[in-house]
Amino acid sequence: MRRTLLVTNDFPPVVGGIQSYLDDYTRRLPADDLTVLASTPPEGPGAAAAHDAALAFDVVRMPTRMLLPTPDVRARMQRIIRERAIETVWFGAAAPLGLLGRAARDAGASRVIVSTHGHEVGWSMIPGARLALRRIFREADVVTHISDYTLGRLRPFMPPGRQVLRLPSGVDVERFRPDADARSRLRARYGLGGAPTVVCVSRLVARKGQDSLIGAWPRVVERVPGARLVIVGWGPYARRLALLKRRSPVRDSIILTGAVPPDELPGHVAMGDVFAMPCRTRGGGLDVEGLGIVFLEASATGLPVIAGTSGGAPETVEDGVTGDVVDGRDGDALVAALVRQLSDPGLRERMGRAGRELMERRWTWPGLVAGLVEAIDAR
């Protein structure tokens, strides 16, 4: 692989969707040819050093919590390009750091790749930000996208003929798989027994729709007695969800686990019978689900899924085959999907098996990484 510099404001140990996305890709690229320029996490340089020491490639941290296309970031990037003979610069999130594309070329890089996610769609709706997107895409050789939805929203701002590459998250089908031992252990931890259980594993933010699950739950329990809802994760919406749980007439059937260790995430998916995250677009279209890696992980684990209609989320599901796609704002549709799946073990088994087969066929890492390397190496 050509010598590559990843410039990103989104990198572990900070937790988030883009952080996980870049972590998954960088760990699979040839380490000797990769350098990362990243910000320092809120936990401080010690946390960054501890994380980076376990990586096979070099990570250069700037002493700031956020990288922006400022003169100091530009200068540091250009110095790395010159000192390490970098040929390809990859901006892990196109906006806003992709504005440094021209500066990367000025320092000697011959190729620029920018990766888009969900937030660039928000930028595309703001007049001033649209101009920035046009400039970012003009300076790039390749624009990657995580879903057909995001590509459709962003292509009008790209120059004619700009090369695009589908580069969604893959799923590790060895890590996320049916796991009877983890399922048994965690169901015992939370006192689930043999209860039909819906799990939602995600960051707690309003877009994800955990509040809709809690709101729908009394009607679900009425039709599926003994059903349990387990919401896994942490985030700014945690306090709101805790309040909704306390006010629910079926609060005893709802569990909020809080944050769990990363190595326990696959097991928390596996302990469920159904995975549901009825995500919905918010903020007049500014806050949208770019894809939804959690749906892929649930399918790989052999669970039927219920996904919302926001952004690219429906692209992770074969509707009616691996799960159901519902409008996250339609409580009746959500209740119907939850009850249908919880009430029919045969349906759950068929959907789960189909989901696992789909992940193995279309969403595994080797082919996705090969496509990225090909884009990096192209002349």
Predicted regions mapped to residue ranges:
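A short, well-ordered alpha-helix in the C-terminal region of glycosyltransferases
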Residues: 226, 333, 340, 347-361
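Short His-centered aromatic/hydrophobic patch
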Residues: 91-97
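Carbohydrate-associated surface elements
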Residues: 149, 170
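Conserved donor-binding/catalytic core segment of Leloir-type glycosyltransferases
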Residues: 192-208, 214-218
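Acidic donor-binding loop of glycosyltransferase active sites
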Residues: 270-288, 303
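Nucleotide-activated donor-binding/catalytic signature segment of Leloir-type glycosyltransferases, i.e.
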Residues: 239-266, 274
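Short hydrophobic beta-strand element within catalytic cores of glycosyltransferases
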Residues: 276, 295, 300, 304-307, ...
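Conserved acidic donor-binding segment of nucleotide-sugar-dependent glycosyltransferases
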Residues: 318-320, 324-331, 340-346
